[in-house]
């Protein structure tokens, strides 16, 4: 279709819809959208679709791949809508909520099981050693470098909701994101409760339900490696046991 002198590109979408107040079961709704030159990422298209149909529900915030709000399943693979290039997607673009979590409405999932596991690993530095109030707890450059590839996690849940072990045991298995963050504090030279952190994970489910499927690595929008972090925790546990 032409708009002025420009040929407008049209894209088709099939989006998961479910409103528990009115729908007996979920369904896929088809949408057509004539793209504007400013439609670069999938989130751009979703925002425009919502302008046409204000009942369509999804989370979004920063639009920069920082907040992690707009995680969803895009053509069968978890990702962030704001980082997903729009025009290269196979059509119709099939968009579903992140798998393995209860659906609140449309593409919005209940993140409670995910954040329960995250909070269970005490995601903060613990150090009871006294220090002068006008000083910081210092690290060498080498100690700081140990945290690279760990602290960048934005808690979007793309990795944990791509993990079959988390689907099956969300109340028992910490999940890739939680375990990546657990290792982030185990590896932190300023933290003094390493043994407590390891004891917290020394359970048939919490850590050892990872089967190195590596879906987490494949979908992480920040290109992190939870499987490697999980392996590091297991290695530390083994060294502690012998």
Predicted regions and their residues:
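Short, Lys/Arg-enriched N-terminal segments with co-localized hydrophobic residues
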Residues: 1-7
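Glycine-rich phosphate/adenylate-binding loop and adjacent beta-alpha elements
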Residues: 76-96
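Short, structured protein-protein interaction patches enriched in aromatics and acidic/basic residues
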Residues: 62-71
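Short, contiguous acidic and Ser/Thr-rich linear segments
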Residues: 29-40
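Active-site phosphate-binding and catalytic loops of NTP-dependent enzymes
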Residues: 53-59
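Short structural boundary motif marking the start of a folded domain
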Residues: 8-13
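Short strand-turn-strand beta-turns centered on an Asx-Gly dipeptide
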Residues: 34, 73-77
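Ferredoxin-type iron-sulfur electron-transfer modules in oxidoreductases and energy-metabolism complexes
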Residues: 40-53, 96-242
């Amino acid at each position: 279709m032409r708009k002025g002198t420009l040929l407008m590109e049209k894209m088709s979408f099939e989006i998961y819809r479910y409103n528990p107040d009115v729908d007996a079961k979920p369904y896929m709704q088809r949408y057509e959208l004539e793209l504007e030159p400013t439609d670069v990422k999938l989130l751009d298209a979703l925002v425009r679709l919502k302008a046409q149909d204000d009942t369509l529900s999804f989370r979004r915030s920063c639009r920069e791949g920082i907040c992690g709000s707009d995680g969803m399943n895009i053509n069968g693979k978890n990702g962030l809508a704001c980082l997903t290039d729009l025009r290269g997607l196979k059509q119709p673009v099939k968009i579903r909520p992140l798998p393995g979590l209860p659906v609140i409405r449309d593409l919005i999932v209940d993140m409670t099981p995910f954040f329960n596991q995250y909070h269970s690993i005490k995601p903060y530095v613990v150090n009871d050693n006294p220090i002068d109030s006008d000083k910081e707890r210092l690290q060498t450059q080498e100690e700081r470098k140990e945290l690279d590839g760990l602290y960048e996690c934005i808690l979007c849940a793309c990795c944990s909701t791509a993990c079959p072990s988390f689907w099956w045991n969300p109340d028992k298995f910490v999940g890739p994101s939680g375990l990546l963050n657990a290792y982030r504090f185990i590896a932190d030279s300023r933290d003094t409760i390493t043994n407590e952190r390891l004891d917290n994970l020394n359970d048939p489910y919490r850590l050892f339900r990872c089967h190195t499927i590596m879906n987490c690595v494949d979908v992480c929008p920040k290109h992190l490696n939870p499987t490697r972090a999980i392996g590091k925790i297991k290695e530390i546990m083994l060294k502690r046991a012998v």
